[in-house]
């Protein structure tokens, strides 16, 4: 899909491109990452990009994007919560909604929220949901061996975090949380 001349000019620094998001493509690796981004959405587009990546290359790029999402949105590095502390207001609102719904609708109700992976991934890290519990150190160079976090599971389409609230006759409540991110289609 990329000509040899195109790749050589990128590698030599002769060409750079800016994509609509504002990111720059400065070299052949940046161009390959953009091609891989097409590869991972290609099935939804009805296209086959497998001719451009061997399974080993696809796994390497998957790990690269997983590591980026893990550090930027997920559990991140040991001793730091910067990647997911912004989810705290959402967690606080979950609890406030439970209190409000219980008071206003004691016989039952529901609060539904719909969000993208950019919201769900940090939230799962904050509550230490399965797959989002392990933080890594800067010396953990093999990301996939250091953690079980995988973007294909944690940030998947139709992921779900469900809280069911049950109350006994005395009004004591218990919350059951179901994290449905590892369901198979």
Predicted feature residues:
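Signature for phosphate-centric chemistry
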Residues: 1-111, 115-184
């Amino acid at each position: 899909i990329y000509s040899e001349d195109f790749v050589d000019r990128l590698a030599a620094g002769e060409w750079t491109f800016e994509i609509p998001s504002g990111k720059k493509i400065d070299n052949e690796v940046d161009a390959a990452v953009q091609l891989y981004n097409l590869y991972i959405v290609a099935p939804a587009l009805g296209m086959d990009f497998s001719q451009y990546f061997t399974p080993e290359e696809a796994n390497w790029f998957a790990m690269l994007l997983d590591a980026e999402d893990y550090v930027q949105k997920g559990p991140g590095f040991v001793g730091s919560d910067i990647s997911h502390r912004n989810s705290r207001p959402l967690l606080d609102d979950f609890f406030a909604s439970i209190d409000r719904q219980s008071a206003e609708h004691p016989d039952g109700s529901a609060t539904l929220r719909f969000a993208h992976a950019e919201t769900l991934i940090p939230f799962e890290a904050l509550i230490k949901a399965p797959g989002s519990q392990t933080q890594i150190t800067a010396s953990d160079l093999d990301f996939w061996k250091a953690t079980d976090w995988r973007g294909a599971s944690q940030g998947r389409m139709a992921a779900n975090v469900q809280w069911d609230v049950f109350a006994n006759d005395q009004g004591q409540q218990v919350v059951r949380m179901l994290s449905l991110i590892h369901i198979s289609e």
